[in-house]
UniProtKB/Swiss-Prot annotation:
Name the record gives this protein: DNA-directed RNA polymerase subunit beta'
Reaction catalysis annotation: RNA(n) + a ribonucleoside 5'-triphosphate = RNA(n+1) + diphosphate
Gene3D superfamilies, alphabetized: 1.10.132.30, 1.10.150.390, 1.10.1790.20, 1.10.40.90, 2.40.40.20, 2.40.50.100, RNA polymerase II, clamp domain, RNA polymerase Rpb1, domain 3
EC number: 2.7.7.6
Region (Disordered): 1385-1409
Amino acid sequence: MKSLLDLFKQFTPDEHFDAIKIGMASPEKIRSWSFGEVKKPETINYRTFKPERDGLFCAKIFGPIKDYECLCGKYKRLKHRGVICEKCGVEVTQTKVRRERMGHIDLAAPCAHIWFLKSLPSRLGLVLDMTLRDIERVLYFEAYVITDPGMTPLKKFGIMSEDDYDAKRKEYGDEFVAKMGAEGIKDLLEGIELDSEIERLRGDLTGSEVKVKKNSKRLKVLEAFRKSGIKPEWMVLDVLPVLPPDLRPLVPLDGGRFATSDLNDLYRRVINRNSRLRRLLELKAPEIIARNEKRMLQEAVDSLLDNGRRGKAMTGANKRALKSLADMIKGKSGRFRQNLLGKRVDYSGRSVIVVGPTLKLHQCGLPKLMALELFKPFIFSRLEAMGIATTIKAAKKEVESGTPVVWDILEEVIKEHPVMLNRAPTLHRLGIQAFEPILIEGKAIQLHPLVCAAFNADFDGDQMAVHVPLSVEAQMEARTLMLASNNVLFPASGEPSIVPSQDVVLGLYYTTRDRINGKGEGLIFSDIGEVQRALDANEVELTAKVAVRITEYTKDKETGEFTPSTSLVDTTVGRALLSEILPKGLPFSNINKALKKKEISKLINVSFRKCGLKETVVFADKLLQNGFRLATKAGISIAIDDMLVPAEKHGIIERSAKEVKEIEQQYVSGLVTSGERYNKVVDIWGKAGDEVSKVMMAKLSKQKVIDRHGKEVEQESFNSIYMMADSGARGSAAQIRQVAGMRGLMAKPDGSIIETPITANFREGLNVLEYFISTHGARKGLADTALKTANSGYLTRRLVDVTQDLVVTEQDCGTHGGYLMRAIVEGGEVIESLRDRILGRSAADDVLHPENRSVLLKAGEMFDEDNIEELEAQGVDEVKVRTALTCETRFGICATCYGRDLGRGGLINIGEAVGVIAAQSIGEPGTQLTMRTFHIGGAASRAAVASSVEAKSNGVIGFNATMRYVTNSKNELVVIARSGEIVIHDEHGRERERHKVPYGAILAVKADQQIKAGHVLANWDPLTRPIITEFAGKTQFENVEEGLTVAKQVDEVTGLSTLVVIDPKRRGAAKVVRPQVKLIDASGAEVKIPGTDHSVTIGFPIGALVQIRDGQDVGPGEVLARIPVEGQKTRDITGGLPRVAELFEARSPKDKGMLAEMTGTVSFGKETKGKIRLQITDPEGTVWEDLVPKEKNILVHEGQVVNKGESVVDGPADPQDILRLLGSEELARYIVDEVQDVYRLQGVKINDKHIEVIVRQMLRRVVVDNIGETGYISGEQVERSEMLNTNDALRAEGKIPATFTNLLLGITKASLSTDSFISAASFQETTRVLTEAAIMGKRDELRGLKENVIVGRLIPAGTGMAYHQARKAKDQMDEAERRAIAESEAAELAGSTSDVSTTADASEGAASE
């Protein structure tokens, strides 16, 4: 009976695998898969539609067409299962075996596999050590290869043409063997002795760099073959597998035509050519005919495997290239991305969304018809359970008739059953959220207004999809993790995502504004109820200032009890009434101000931190309801008259026009260049526009009123347009400026500014020319948006791919590493405070009190709102925090290093996929970034050139570590450091501001000086760069000869003459000599640099104006020459999305600057053609030198001391240089700061830790330097975690570990070089990745998320992580049980009849493990 039941059992594959291995199939393996040889190219008989025997669809080989029925119809039904029909030879079984049974074709001549030949670098070429060209000539029968030279002087692997071959045959007879075609290559491959070849190469890893590189590449491939046990000759095919027929279907269409998969065509060609070749060989046809046929067979096989890879692609009847096996798996519509990573979903529906203002945050309105369809199976099962319907069919009828009982059941089924709503594009995890459905009439889904921000949805026709989680586990996850009321913070920044916008904000803002001399001003109320009654009786107005007695509750931190306190508060009627909805424990002061959008956001944030999630959600809902109600009550509307155009506008425009005329005049008289004229004109109009908008805002924002005492006073305006902009409901000052000020300057599509401004505004209306000018830039904007979306999506895809395997795997890795964090200060302004940067991170070391060194926070504890306030009060200004980059967890990251989960507000949970979260957080705002490259000029150069810097706050002066200065004869301090900074600390020693001071600046302050705000710190000449001497002495010119290296220039205005160094290209004879100056001391000897025997030599660069005479006495700090700065070319700054992509791809910038390779003294060597030789000598006397093009701006001069990593040639830094010279911490800081700059410009908040997570993934590979006793090859790239594990194992055995250096890879490179071949193949360059993996016989450990999605397992993150851990534990337990049982059986066999309870104990012990 059991065996009978087995017949009906569903076949379930055993899913417990932990890794997937890829390799190359041997001919034996291919034959073992096969169920028969395909001999004929026929497919199916066009009359009977039955497959031809031995053809491509043969039933004998591949299985029956109908379930349990042979082809000729002799055996039908289940009882014959497994019988093989003697007439037609078909096995009686299910037809689905046609999806898994393979066939094979025996090739009459071997054929090389094109992937191993043409996928670069060519694997065949590496193994044989031949060039790709030579191999191709052999394979396609253009040349012979010598496979066995015998006793002749010929070389094995030698190539000879047809004529050579004939000549050599005459000469040597049959002494040597040479072949052409894949046979020759196969013989060579079989002749390779892997072991001896590897030994030879390992010994040969010396010599020139090219040779070493080539040898190590070959070595790697050969080692891979040896390690994986794959024979090289398998790269040449003797037998070709045939795909199961149902995977390359042939479907008859009406009218006798067939739709077929291209593969059938390709296979047909191979079979045709193969059988023709076989026949030719049997007939012993002339060599040349057979050769041609072999070549055609090789080409047919190539096309089948990868069409178009070599030569022209094979085409079908309609001139379209046929889709080969390789095309099936690669690209967006290939197997990986189309079917494995994204699948279609059942139980889903989509419809238009409309607003649901009465819903609670965790609800959505679901149309009844949609719900009925989605929950059908649940309804059927209820109907059967209740006995209303006996069968599914009856239940179906019942539902379709729509009886009332069905609707009752639907209500019941839907209760407590969350559904998921998704709006495309899903850019971050808040794009899918779960809601409890509420049944509604109509056909549109109702959405809660507060979740619109997270979905980026609006109600102008957006559609959303609904998905039903079916299993209990899925429902549970949807409810606990995805319910909208559990996702109130953005994972990117930790800010609330449920912030009201638009009309709600306007309503709340209007209610909380105060009006001078409003109705009922000055009244005093005993409680809020009284205020409400007075308002209802129309005794007071909403915005009147009144005093009210209000009771506040403060929560005790330890006990959680509330203590009330009551006081009289000056407020307004609206605010007092609004205070009723405040959650218990929030002070009234939070709401006692005009509530703008930012304030409301802060309010919700404070509520979340102080009162918890539940209270906050309820509070947000109440805010929403009140906002809608109050906006309606306020009745704010706008009219043309609200757009007040300032009277002064006309005057400002006239004045600017006059200035422009003057400049035109100057240009005509030749006083200014055309570029200067353009810049100045743009400047004037830019200023005019700003001025008009200032005047306009001043007019809009204030209004005059009479107060209670009859005086005229100003108050904030109640102008509707102003209120909308001020509250943050809609519009901004810039938009109002276009409506009521002047539109100002417009840009051309290339980003340059048109110098004719639009002086009109929208209220006045534009004339034709103005309209035309404005269309120019506007159209560019539309085109940009389309590009931007695609680019941003691609960036997100690359980011997700590089981080997808990063998951929190342990609680604490125990490292003490970390980065010092301090506030970001730029140009004296705090851009990001220390508080914002360390909030939600963990301390790396104990945080000490700055004065008495007591411990304020222990290492490993997290900074939260409360203890940060404590730190700020104590004056802590820098903190060492744990970061994702210093985390020492292998294959993952630890919770302590990551810190707070921004989307939830607590410490991150183990199993959270922080990599994907980081990628989404950076990619999601991508569409808001600009696409354009900013041209310096016009708008950008408007910032006037700074010539001094002043303090913005009181404090004490300090300098940074690299600051150096000398005192000159006038007793002024002259800066001689390249990267000097002045730092101002307050009385607690906290850094308040930090200012860069250029080389040659004169300091107006000393260290530790007390200063007041507004004090000038330093000043300098912005138009020239000085060259300054650090030593005293008498000048002695060298090579300064007029007409040769310098020219005399006479100033037209002053009549003074100066010497200017001329360009060597314009000089005659003295191309090589450098004009320079030496210093002579009193005794006539050359002044030396202290501590060395270098004499002080200062070179004058091209274009320098020499400020001294020969033989003049100079003191330290004196200016020897000045270089006009004007010479710097304006370069375009890449901004927006392209900049972010550039940083994450770790590309070297176009004209990159140069950093000092080591600490030492600068000198210039002999110049070569067009290049300057820059040398740095360190204290030990080691010299490093490099050639710098003359047009580059060198920031250092002869004799200057530079620190390692300091900038010596102007230009953007190369991330690779930063990593090499300054280490990974500096690199991380550079990338984080640069990326943040781009986002900050657009007002997007992203937490630093997301960028750090990406940088960690960019640094996850290392390069092996010294191999120690590992099996690596020098120069090989290895996963960092694997390297560390290997080294730990070696240390434990007392062997020599390998040394390595960090490697920075761009995100695309990093994704492709991941250890998981499945993930890399599904990302890009599928062919290359799979070829490499197959040769190496790679194992994919299925660590990342992507691999697991592709093979269809639960992902090892979140709840899946627990599942996998439990599964592994169970496997180990089973193993232990099996061992115990085996042992007990062995013991019994040994004749001992010991108590069986011991085995039970053993298995229990294993279980308790």
